[in-house]
Swiss-Prot record:
<dbReference type="GO" id="GO:0003879">
    <property type="term" value="F:ATP phosphoribosyltransferase activity"/>
</dbReference>
<protein>
    <recommendedName>
        <fullName>ATP phosphoribosyltransferase</fullName>
        <ecNumber>2.4.2.17</ecNumber>
    </recommendedName>
</protein>
<dbReference type="InterPro" id="IPR011322">
    <property type="entry name" value="N-reg_PII-like_a/b"/>
</dbReference>
<dbReference type="InterPro" id="IPR020621">
    <property type="entry name" value="ATP-PRT_HisG_long"/>
</dbReference>
<keyword id="KW-0328">Glycosyltransferase</keyword>
<dbReference type="InterPro" id="IPR018198">
    <property type="entry name" value="ATP_PRibTrfase_CS"/>
</dbReference>
<dbReference type="InterPro" id="IPR013115">
    <property type="entry name" value="HisG_C"/>
</dbReference>
<dbReference type="GO" id="GO:0005524">
    <property type="term" value="F:ATP binding"/>
</dbReference>
<keyword id="KW-0808">Transferase</keyword>
<comment type="pathway">
    <text>Amino-acid biosynthesis; L-histidine biosynthesis; L-histidine from 5-phospho-alpha-D-ribose 1-diphosphate: step 1/9.</text>
</comment>
<comment type="function">
    <text>Catalyzes the condensation of ATP and 5-phosphoribose 1-diphosphate to form N'-(5'-phosphoribosyl)-ATP (PR-ATP). Has a crucial role in the pathway because the rate of histidine biosynthesis seems to be controlled primarily by regulation of the enzymatic activity.</text>
</comment>
<dbReference type="GO" id="GO:0000287">
    <property type="term" value="F:magnesium ion binding"/>
</dbReference>
<dbReference type="Pfam" id="PF08029">
    <property type="entry name" value="HisG_C"/>
</dbReference>
<dbReference type="GO" id="GO:0000105">
    <property type="term" value="P:L-histidine biosynthetic process"/>
</dbReference>
<keyword id="KW-0067">ATP-binding</keyword>
<keyword id="KW-0547">Nucleotide-binding</keyword>
<dbReference type="InterPro" id="IPR013820">
    <property type="entry name" value="ATP_PRibTrfase_cat"/>
</dbReference>
Length: 306
């Protein structure tokens, strides 16, 4: 990592080097025109389109590097930010991917535990020790009705294969991330409580940016990423309609700010262009058709600035 000391003219952007967030982060950077070439042996890649150096790190380490000011920006899970306990971090943007839940899971077979309060005083296995400890401390205080100085629940750290802990007798329950739930069910576990809902975030150190040009570059990056996220969420809908139907149709397609309305070279007709939510496009097109619109088309938005 000595190479970093020679990158003073570049913004340092920490991103996951592998794992569940890696591929989506690469796609987001590519969509933001943050292009780079990465050698298989290096955890640093220079951006070819902007003065940025990408620093590839384990997702769990990114809050530390950003919080201590070693990197200017980072992408990691909210779970990792909370687990780090570093308060000097600003959550700039929810990136909308990597969504999952940090959940308390117990063996399904005997249904011995149905409420997390039943686990007070037991052994909990997790790779999220801080979040687990904070959660069970709160439970203990609720059960006892008073502040707890020393936790009676034992929190045991395991770095991987956490879901095997109950079957092997390492713990009574686990606290682990659940995305689809397939791994949990395959291990014979069920969830009984959610500790945290998490997704990937763009993060920044909570300190004044001394370099104005770097501050401006951060704003460019934020704008580009927001543009990609907006383009993923919306499509452009275009249709023609008699002016008499316009008022009702605009209730269906109000747009992000307002629709674009143009007169056609046909008396009494107008063309409407409006951004609509991608997930609702089929329903919106059906409703437009029912209310008298014609020539209804939907176009992809490859990128935008909002």
């Amino acid at each position: 990592m000595d190479f970093v000391n020679h990158l003073n003219d570049r913004l340092l952007f920490a991103v996951p080097k592998k794992g569940r967030l890696y591929e989506k982060t690469k796609q987001l950077l590519n969509g933001s025109d943050i292009k780079f070439n990465r050698s298989n042996r290096l955890d640093i890649a220079l951006c070819t389109t902007l003065p940025i150096a990408l620093i590839f790190l384990p997702a769990a380490d990114i809050p530390t590097f950003v919080g201590e000011g070693k990197c200017d920006l980072g992408i990691t899970g909210l779970d990792q930010v909370k687990e780090s306990g570093i308060e000097e971090i600003d959550l700039l943007m929810d990136l909308g991917f990597g969504g999952c839940k940090l959940q308390v899971q117990v063996p399904e077979k005997d249904r011995k535990y149905t409420d997390p309060k039943q686990l007070v005083g037991k052994t909990i296995v997790s790779s999220f020790v801080k979040l687990s400890r904070d959660y069970f401390q709160q439970l203990e205080e609720e059960v006892l009705g008073k502040p707890v100085d020393k936790l009676s629940t034992k929190i045991k750290y395991v770095g991987g294969s956490v879901e095997a802990s109950c079957a092997l007798g390492v713990g009574d329950a686990i606290v682990d991330l659940v995305e689809s739930g397939e791994t949990m069910r395959a291990a014979g576990l069920i969830d009984i409580a959610t500790v945290l809902e998490t997704s990937a975030y763009l993060i920044q150190a909570r300190r004044p940016q001394q370099d104005k040009s770097r501050e401006e570059l951060i704003e460019v990056i934020k704008s580009r990423i927001q543009g990609v996220l907006t383009a993923q969420r919306y499509v452009c809908c275009s249709y023609n309609t008699p002016e008499g139907n316009l008022k009702e149709l605009l209730k269906v397609t109000p747009g992000r700010r307002a629709p674009t309305i143009s007169k056609l070279d046909d008396d009494g007709w107008v063309a409407v262009n409006s951004m609509i939510e991608r997930k609702r496009k089929a329903d919106i097109m059906d409703e437009l058709k029912r209310k008298g619109a014609s020539d209804i088309m939907v176009f992809e938005i490859s990128n935008c600035r909002v």
